[in-house]
């Protein structure tokens, strides 16, 4: 009788990701003008080199919302080099391999997404669209600040995950849990 030795069971992430590796994360929203831009800047800062964030949209607006750039500047987060772009750039040959795709708006979460090379882990972190707020300049600024605070809470939870030591089912559950995290932004 021939005995074969099989490898111990590991998740695709444990096989694919090892210690010291930078994880590529793609944040998606419809217009790629506010929420996904804020998330990209936050993760590239708070991820401290462990993560490289990108952002894109299903129907990019063509420009980043000026209040998003203003808020990034006022909070000392990176604000240069952002552009509103299509998610197709990240599904094309030669695109950076993406490990996580996170939608930050309900519209993008409900759309049929491209097939992402490498089958990244996905999650939805719904955040109200600050660009849709009508009212005074102060009310609009508050909406952007609230979105940034909610994203910051979730990004901090994400960066604290021991990704390399979690199996894929546990990691997926943790990502969903982060997406359901309520934040107290009433004082925004």
Q: Where do the PLM segments sit?
A:
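Short polar/charged helix/loop
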Residues: 2-188
């Amino acid at each position: 009788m021939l005995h074969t030795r099989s490898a111990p069971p590991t998740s695709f992430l444990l096989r694919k990701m090892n210690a010291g590796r930078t994880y590529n994360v793609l944040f998606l929203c419809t217009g790629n003008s506010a929420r996904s831009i804020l998330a990209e800047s936050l993760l590239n800062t708070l991820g401290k080199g462990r993560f490289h964030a990108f952002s894109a949209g299903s129907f990019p607006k063509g420009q980043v919302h000026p209040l998003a750039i203003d808020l990034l500047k006022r909070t000392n987060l990176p604000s240069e080099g952002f552009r509103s772009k299509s998610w197709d750039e990240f599904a094309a040959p030669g695109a950076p391999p993406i490990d996580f795709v996170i939608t930050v708006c309900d519209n993008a979460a409900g759309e049929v997404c491209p097939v992402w090379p490498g089958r990244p882990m996905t999650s939805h972190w719904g955040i109200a669209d600050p660009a849709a707020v009508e009212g005074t300049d102060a009310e609009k600024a508050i909406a952007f600040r609230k979105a940034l605070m909610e994203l910051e809470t979730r990004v901090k939870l994400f960066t604290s995950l021991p990704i390399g030591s979690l199996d894929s089912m546990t990691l997926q559950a943790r990502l969903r849990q982060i997406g359901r995290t309520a934040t107290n932004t009433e004082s925004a």
